[in-house]
Amino acid sequence: TQKGGVLVTLGGGKAKEVQDQSEPSRQEGAILTAAHVDTLGAVVAEVKVNGRLRLSPIGAVSAHILETENCRVCTRFGEVYEGTCQLVNASYHVNGEFNQIVRNYQNIEIVLDEDVASAEDVKKLGIDNGDYVCFDPVTKITKSGYIKSRFLDDKLSAAILMGYAKYLKETGKTPKRKVYQYFTVFEEIG
């Protein structure tokens, strides 16, 4: 879509034209389900000369919540590398302004859990600008059955919609009515 969302048609029966628009037939019309996926992660914006990665956000990921978070860098070649997001000058004992620094995408970076010390070392791994960075959602299911996770607010709905699409594909079933799925990249607004 124009706003970056994804509209998927799952097939199904043909939605019939409704003659009287004031009384749409719920039995014959198409169905649209939606979920938002506004907090997606980041991409590598730069492989720095010291082997660390500068980021650019995808969606509404605030830099101040990412400090010390574990992450995965997914290359376009299918390799996955782990790392940690940290402040550029992360030493509390050396950085006298540690507590005053506003965390933003200009002063946080990814330190890879690999033996790298230069941009060349990182590029040998296949990591480059545009590769995806996925942050650990820190998911936990409590004894009482609650699910706690970062970025959960509507990812669960997105997972349910994708699970339904997978179910239809794997079983070969076709819905009786036309079914659309819409994944928005904005908070509940499409």
Per-segment meaning from a language model:
Residues T1-G190:
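N-terminal hydrophobic/helix-forming segments and targeting peptides
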